[in-house]
C-alpha cells in the first residue's frame, strides 16, 4: 500500500487539529460561523473559489474550480459535530486533537472533519502527482448534518446549477468489522415522529388505578400495536411503495461475506429478529424499512418509589425508509392505524424535517472505478453495500443533481463515532486517502489505471 507522503501527513494533522479545536456542535448551534470560515480558508488554499452561502440555519461552504469542457467531481461533507457529553468518559480533551497509539482522538476526527481533511489532502496529493488536474472540483460542506440537514434539500434545489457535477464523494466511509473496505451505494430515509397522550388533567394517586386510565399502559399498548415481534410493521399501506431489489442489488447482497457473528458479539445479542442470517440478514439490514422506538416517557423514573398514576405519556419513534417510500405519508398512515385500532386519543406529529431514501446503481461506472481502487489499495475486494441502515441528505444529490455518490473513507467500526473517545487510525487515513486518489485517477484516466 502506498502511504500518504510525510509532508501531507503533517498537513493532515495540522488541518484536522484546527477544525477539531472549534466545538461546532450542531445541536447547540455554536461554532458554525468560525468553523465555516476555517473550512473556507482551507479550501481556498487548494486554489478553489470559496463562498459562504447562508441558509435558514448554519452556512454552507461552497467552493469550486471548474475546468472548461471537462467533467466535475463533487464532494459533500459537513463541519458540525455531535455533543461531547459525557465529558468524564473522554481520556483527553475532546476539542484538542490528541495522538496516541497510532490513533488521532477528538470530536469530529471521524465524523466528519477527518473525512473532509482526507478529501482535501487527496486533491493536494493528486496535483503533486499530475500537476493541474483535468477535471473540475466542487465542495458543498454544510453545518447541520448532525441535526438532520433541515436546509440541505432546499439548498441543493436552489443551487443546482452551481452544484452541477458528473460524479461525487459522500461524506463518510471506511472498513467493516473484518477490516474489509466497504463501498456503500445508498442511504435509508428517516421520518421522526412524536406520539403524545393525556388521560387525565394531572398525575393522580395510584389508588385511582381501578377506575382511571393509566397513560403509561395506554401508550405502551398503542406502541405495541405498531409492529410484531419479528419487526414487521403492522401499519396498513406501510410497505406499498417499497421498491423490489434489482437483480444486481440481490447479487451484491448475497456476495456480502458473513458478518453475523461479529455483529452479534459487538451488540451483545444471541439472535437477530426473525432468526435472520446470511443474505436474509443483509436484505433486512439494507433493504427493509423499519419502525424503531427511540424512547418512552411517563410517570416517575427516579430513585425509590412514587405511587403515581401517570396522566400523560410520550413516545419518540423513527421510521427508516427505503425507495420509493415517501416520508410525508408516514404520519397519515400512522394516524389511520391508531384510529382504526382504538387509539384515536394518541396524537402523532412529524418531528424533525424528514430525509428521503436514495440509492446509486452499484454497477454505475464511477462506482466500479471506486470498487477497483479499493481492491487495489486494500488488497481485498470491496464489500458492496447496497444501502446503509443509516440516513443522510443523499436524496437531493442523487435525484435532484443526478450525481452518483461514492461512499468510501477513513473510518472503522471502532471509531466511537458520536461517543466519547472518537478517533481515527493512522493506517486508515493512509488507505482511505489513497483510495480517493486512485478512484479519481481511474475515473479521469490519469496515472496507472
Spans of model-derived segments:
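Short glycine/proline-enriched loop/turn "hinge" motifs that connect secondary-structure elements
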Residues: 8-9, 89, 131-132, 184-190, ...
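Alpha-helical metal-binding/catalytic segments enriched in His/Glu/Asp
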Residues: 75, 98-148, 193-197, 208-229, ...
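A generic structural motif
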Residues: 110, 201-203, 208, 319-327
